[in-house]
């Protein structure tokens, strides 16, 4: 990830009272292909980091479907091709959520995400 994105991640984490937790380019996220369709809002939630999995799950639309095949694994280094607007949120720690749309941003803590 480039230096500007890392600085933006730290700024967002700090502004919202969170510790910055790195998400390496070599790590994986769970993502739905619908993020490439221009659907809003875009949502992200972060479970604890396990191995090479960042804990991030990202999807577009209001609700997260319960379908087991909803998320596909993707290395963070490819997110710039899929959904570059989420990169600046990937420094939020496990137990965080975000939702973004045109001129809208919401970031909050959800400790239930830590109980996985």
List each language-model region with its residue ranges.
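Substrate-binding/catalytic groove segments of enzymes
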Residues: 65-67, 97-98
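Extended, charge-biased low-complexity segments
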Residues: 1-14
């Amino acid at each position: 990830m480039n230096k500007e994105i890392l600085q933006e991640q730290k700024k967002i984490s700090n502004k919202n009272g969170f510790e910055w937790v790195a998400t390496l380019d070599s790590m994986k996220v769970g993502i739905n292909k619908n993020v490439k369709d221009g659907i809003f809002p875009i949502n992200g939630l972060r479970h604890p980091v396990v191995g090479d999995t960042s804990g991030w799950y990202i999807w577009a639309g209001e609700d997260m479907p319960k379908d087991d095949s909803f998320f596909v694994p993707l290395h963070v280094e490819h997110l710039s091709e899929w959904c570059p607007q989420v990169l600046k949120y990937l420094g939020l720690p496990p137990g965080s959520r975000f939702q973004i749309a045109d001129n809208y941003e919401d970031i909050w803590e959800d400790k239930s995400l830590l109980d996985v």
